[in-house]
From Swiss-Prot:
It is found in: Chromosome. Keywords: Chromosome, Coiled coil, Metal-binding, Methylation, Phosphoprotein, Repeat, RNA-binding, Transcription, Transcription regulation, Transcription termination, Zinc, Zinc-finger. Its main location: nucleus. PROSITE patterns: ZF_C3H1 (PS50103). Residues 94-128, 778-809 form a coiled coil. Residues 1-33, 506-529, 538-556, 603-622, 669-683, 994-1005 have a biased composition (Pro residues). SMART domains: ZnF_C3H1. GO terms for biological process: DNA-templated transcription termination; lncRNA catabolic process; negative regulation of DNA-templated transcription, elongation; negative regulation of lncRNA transcription; nuclear RNA surveillance. This is Zinc finger CCCH domain-containing protein 4.
Amino acid sequence: MEAVPGTPPPPPSESPPPPSPPPPSTPSPPPCSPDGRAATPHLLHHRLPLPDDREDGELEEGELEDDGAEEVQDPPGGQERSRKEKGEKHHSDSEEEKSHRRLKRKRKKEREKEKRRSKKRRKSKHKRHASSSDDFSDFSDDSDFSPSEKSHRKYRDYSPPYAPSHQQYSSSHNAPLPKKSYSKMDSKGYSMYEDYENEQYGEYEGDEEEDMGKEDYDDFTKELNQYRRAKEGSSRGRGSRGRGRGYRGRGSRGGSRGRGMGRGSRGRGRGSMGEHPEDEEDLYEEEIEYGESEEPMGDDDYDDYSKELNQYRRSKDSRGRGLSRGRGRGSRGGRGKGMGRGRGRGGRGGMSKGGMNDDEDFYDDDMGDGGGGSYRRSDHDKPHQQSDKKGKVICKYFVEGRCTWGDHCNFSHDIELPKKRELCKFYITGFCARAENCPYMHGDFPCKLYHTTGNCINGDDCMFSHDPLTEETRELLDKMLADDAEAGAEDEKEVEELKKQGINPLPKPPPGVGLLPTPPRPPGPPAPTSPNGRPMQGGPPPPPPPPPPPPGPPQMSLPTHEPLSPQQLQQDMYNKKIPSLFEIVVRPTGQLAEKLGVRFPGPGGPSGPMGPGPNMGPPGPMGGPMHPDMHPDMHPDMHPDMHPDMHPDMHPDMHPDMHPDMPMGPGMNPGPPMGPGGPPMMPYGPGDSPHSGMMPPIPPAQNFYENFYPQQEGMEMEPGLVGDAEDYGHYEELPGQPGEPLFPEHPLEPDSFPEGGPPGRPKAGAGVPDFLPSAQRALYLRIQQKQQEEERARRLAESSKQDRENEEGDTGNWYSSDEDEGGSSVTSILKTLRQQTSSRPQASVGEPSSSGLGDPRLQKGHPTGSRLSDPRLSRDPRLSRHAETSGGSGPGDSGPSDPRLARALPTSKAEGSLHSSPAGPSSSKGQPPAEEEEGERALREKAVNIPLDPLPGHPLRDPRSQLQQFSHIKKDVTLSKPSFARTVLWNPEDLIPLPIPKQDVPPVPAALQSLPALDPRLHRSTPPGPPNTRQRPGSTDPSTSGSNLPDFELLSRILKTVNVNTPGQSEKPSDPRVRKTPTDPRLQKPADPVAASRAAKPCPTEASPPAASPSGDSSPPATAPYDPRVLAAGGLGQGSSSGQSSVLSGISLYDPRTPNAGGKTAEPASDTSAQPKGPEGNGKGSASKAKEPPFVRKSALEQPETGKASTDGATATDRYNSYNRPRPKATAAPTAASSTPPPEGATPQPGVHNLPVPTLFGTVKPAPKTGTGSPFAGNSPAREGEQDAGSLKDVFKGFDPTASPFCQ
């Protein structure tokens, strides 16, 4: 700002521009001339015009400077003369200006002398600076300025204005901005300035340049020079001003002229638009001066920059900024910078040439025109600039990584910038927009996997460097490893703290495991990513996070499919549909894969694999337990084998390709559980679809568990199932080894091992999404445990009631064997409730741990034994088996068939074990395995179906598990606002506003009243009318879920009602769904009995989730769990797509699509079964949601009151249980919930504990539409008691963010 004083403010009258100068004028205080007057706009104008004059003078000075101080010396006089002449000319402009100019000239002369000295000094300095010493004589700066004086002026204008502009605009610019500033300002600022110049300074230029331009310029120059001199003398010594002044001080004026001038209040003021620029310039100059101190950077850079800027400016001038630019700049910055520059140039060259005219010439010169000095300077400058451009001057901004000019930059970018020793966080995600220009490390970052294990699964395709470690890379690798270790330690601490609090967080996913599927290319994740590489879904990814950046991509890079390459099926499956979070197979990153893969290959590998290793290590056990729990856990721990449901079996399989996929196999989890049928399990559907998507295994996980357990019990998943193992056939053997231990362990600790937490928790754990942070997960598990306990108690209570009516669902008997695994409660339930047993078997199948959860489902489904089977079949089997069935056969029918089959099969026993599976498997897989008739066969088939459904199934389970965890909350919420809350929940996520009304329309109360009939109908219809059944199952399931959620008393009542109504409900269910209004009234009526009403409502809400589950069950695709996926895929994209579509549709029901459902009316039931399938749940979702949800609600509510609760509860329970019981289900369940709305799905995954509830709700919402609600209803049962109380609603609100909208 010193410059400000430097420029005497000419009377504004001096030139018309004064008005424009105000801006400069404002800066003018800084531009005060040495006289002490604030540079008035006039002065600024002068400055602007001065650029011409100055340019002339400056050119001379600049020339001198450029040429060396020599010319500067000559020009000083010449410039002075020119300036004087100009001054005289400008004299007319204003006396004051003239005096100022004269003073300035004197000062300038003195300054020029000083500057020459300074320049000489600088020259030596500059000479030190390669760039400076180049063409521009010593003073690269000065020279730069000189030759590029104009350019420089521009540069300065640019740069100071630019910088100033930046500085003006952002005042931190000074030196730093310069480069960029220069460049940018050059173009931008300059443009602005140009305009500014042209506008404000333009006038100044015009008037001042013409009038004042020359004389004033001289005077101004003199004054500025004097000012500068004073300034320089005072502080920087113009020359010493460093580049700023010295630079600017190309001549005496250089100082004033250059920035000096700019600096000189005028130059700068003018140069910059107004004072700020000047100030900025001053600042800049000061900085530059300091730059002198900074010389290396300042002078050198400045010189370089000056050169480049000068060149740039010159080119620009040449381009057209031309005079105005040169001058404009000159005027503007010109007077300040421009002047300094312009003048420097003009002055330098100009002076040599002839002063003022030269100034103009200089402009021309700059533009390419030029007079002697100008020309010379131009010559000098141009070559200089070009040389600079060509690499003489390194772009300082480029060095700083902020040059925006790119290839157009006038400065050299020919330097190899050292990369920041840090992995580019964008690169690891698979795309860095800066590509090779990125200052962070990309492919040159060391591959952690490769350098730590010596074997990178990505091989040559690895994103990271496999080159021998250098000191630098070793340091980076060590740092990364240290960070990983630190992160791991932190996680351990967190886990310890949680454990102290009594919370058993789910195991974290292996370092390489993540929620997101591993992208194919980023996969070459650097070893670092391996930890992150396979960021698991679970919160576990956090540990990997440190390396995540590298790992993240690597992990991601490991395409989930890639791992599936061997598992083309899974890959295909994935390709066919958009995987949901739960469905996503997270493949360990290359490193992880290597670690896991390396181990994976061996039986031990599966256990050993990092993810599986830890979890899998116990994989068998853990795997088994993890199965359900593992869903999430699997992601984290079983992660590797996750994919493989087949974890154990697949392990071998996995290692080969699953291995990376393993993570994928949340669903695959079941694979391991299939332990006995381990290989079969793997084959079960996952084998085929298994990998087809970890997910398929996931759904199977539910069924799978059932199958698995039943298998263990005797089914052993029959090799037939193993047939699915075809894919794993070779693995079967391998799995035998790892699988055996895994399987046995699995069976041993299926529940406890869920790794979700305590054995009891497994279900909850299973429900817990892996992506949840450990704390949340622990919380979630805890909640789930409580819910499970409650549900178990309920189931036990209900078991007796349901037992009577469960006989209807003898099919549940086959579940009993599954149930054995389900848990003690399952056993008691089996004894007490066959239906419950059935549902529980589902839970068992889902996982023993989910037995508790399963029990709730069972309880829910228990009311109606047959329904229970249906719901179960619809739900668990449907989800898993149906998915499979659908996958196998056409799921559209499969879905509906599943429910019916579920009934018929359960009845016939074909799918006895798989209540849902019977329908689905019967149609697709259930039927294929004739043995299925036997409970074990059914289980096996279930297992088989599971593979197809795995992804959906598991997600369903997970969601259910989550639901179970939040079942109490859900119930409350459901009770409070079954349909509306449900809608609300989805509304935010899925924009289910329409569904809300429709769901509301079919109020749960009405549903409860009619539901008893409807539910029974649904259940019965299911057996009688496969289509209806399918639809019914959806409805029934939702109802069942709802019923399960409702109080046991209600359930018993409902059961009675159901028994009475079951026969006639087959057709009505569809209609009732369609006719939600009656349902609503009924539901409302039931509302009278708070318990019934609330139960009904909760049921609907929960039923909705269960419905989704049943839907999923109905639709074998089991995409329901991944409804989002299904929705995205337009169906599961599995064979069970149709069935799943229904399910998904059901889930979709709550999806925004739900609102779409035009067929919400009568289609609900239908939609649930078949119609929705086509739409993939969109239409179905809409139709079902609108109507079916109401109906479902009815069903759900009714079921809670009626036996429907039993059947649907079973389904719901299945789903719910699956959700609770199998961790995979947890994943699946969230998926199911999320499947309805992808957002939901996503939400569940992000915050399992929270999401699960919302998921349940979300699921519930769709459930009403489809049978999905039932499963959730199943979940509701746990909350049944709570449902009655509005408090649950509050609880839910408190519990889940989504819940509050839902509650509302």
